Amino acid sequence: MVRRLLISLIRAEARRGRNQILPEAAFTGDPRIDEEGLGFDSLARLDLIGAVRDFFDLSRTGIEDYVYVEPTLQGWIDRIMQHFDLLAARSETAQAVFRTSGSTGTPKPIPHPWPKLMREAASMARDQGLVPAPGGAVIGLVPAHHLFGCLFTALLPELAGAALRDLTAAPPASALRTAQPGDLIIATPHLWAHLGAAGAFPPGLRGVSSGAPMPDALWHSLLAAGLEDLTEVYGASETGGIGLRRAPGAAFTLLPFLSRSADDGISDGPAPLPLQDRLRWTGPVRFVIEGRLDQALQVGGVNVRLGHVKSVLEAEPGVEALALRLGGDRLKAFVVCAADAEAGLEARLRARAEAGLDAPARPQHYRFGRALPLTREGKARDWD
């Protein structure tokens, strides 16, 4: 588990710092974590140690000082295990610290105690049967240092005694070329769309999706392409998993260790969960999602705050009003501009988005008009 999580953090820092994708072969044996080994110079190595410290909460024991002098991957793993042992000796609970997937500002740290993460992964395996068939493997397309990936590609394979094939550094379609009957594919809707576009699925494959809503049309197309079944897990970085469903258009079923509270929220024991969405209950443990509470959309598994995107784009001279919606799996924008401002405005908006917004928050399609699209009742509506 620790090795899988550590490799995921290393890959993320390599991509963030120098836009390099480290293949699986780079981690064969016990590679050195330096410039000659995995390509981290002294400054990049410090940044990586900081990311590892924050995720594993190493400051509680001070073990990051010892990680700094360890030259190899296995040395880092040993020190992280020592951190866990020190906390256990003090009767303290270890935790992983995830980050919200927000596209604006600094992502918030969200600590999750390891026992609760293990409980959720065990429930997914034991209660929900989300494990590979005997002899099958978990095929991971999502990073393990994100909550969804941690649960399903780090903890669940270990609990189920299943092999893991980590394809986060490979094209999504490679999952179909290497898959065997009984395998379980872990991916976000954005990645599932790429898998669906790659052709027919080999027989006997099952899947799990999370990180963003799974569109019904995509779900139907995956089943038509030969995917045996798909389970969508609903949750958030702030809460962990909350519910799941096994058919498009169905209500979600609350996970068994959670409960509906008196105010129609959700509780984990006595603690209310900080829900990100409005829920409508259709039964004692079944609910449907009716939209975000914070005016955010999920684009490629990343929370995009529409208010921030609007404020960035509306600052462009000539923009009088602007509306944002999902168009497929990316944002689209409808722009009302001054009569003499449309020429060149799209190029300027794209440049402003490139400079001021993360990739998921940048609209891919722009449309211009004299007024924002409204229904007869004066409510905002979609556009082609």
From Swiss-Prot:
InterPro entries named among the record's database cross-references: 4_coum_CoA_lig (IPR012743), AMP-bd_C (IPR025110), AMP-bd_C_sf (IPR045851), AMP-binding_CS (IPR020845), AMP-dep_synth/lig_dom (IPR000873), ANL_N_sf (IPR042099), ATP-dep_AMP-bd_enzyme (IPR050237)
A GO MF term: ATP binding
The keyword Transmembrane is annotated on this UniProt entry: no
GO biological process: phenylpropanoid metabolic process
Taxonomic superkingdom: Bacteria
SUPFAM superfamilies: Acetyl-CoA synthetase-like
EC number: 6.2.1.12
Reactions this protein catalyses: (E)-4-coumarate + ATP + CoA = (E)-4-coumaroyl-CoA + AMP + diphosphate
Keyword set, alphabetical order: ATP-binding, Ligase, Nucleotide-binding, Phenylpropanoid metabolism
Matches recorded under PANTHER family: LONG-CHAIN-FATTY-ACID--COA LIGASE (PTHR43767), NONRIBOSOMAL PEPTIDE SYNTHASE PES1 (EUROFUNG)-RELATED (PTHR43767:SF1)
Protein family (similarity comment): Belongs to the ATP-dependent AMP-binding enzyme family.
UniProt function note: Converts p-coumaric acid into p-coumaryl CoA. This is necessary for the activation of the photoactive yellow protein (PYP) chromophore.
Protein name: 4-coumarate--CoA ligase
Species assigned in the record: Rhodobacter capsulatus (strain ATCC BAA-309 / NBRC 16581 / SB1003)
Gene encoding the protein: pcl
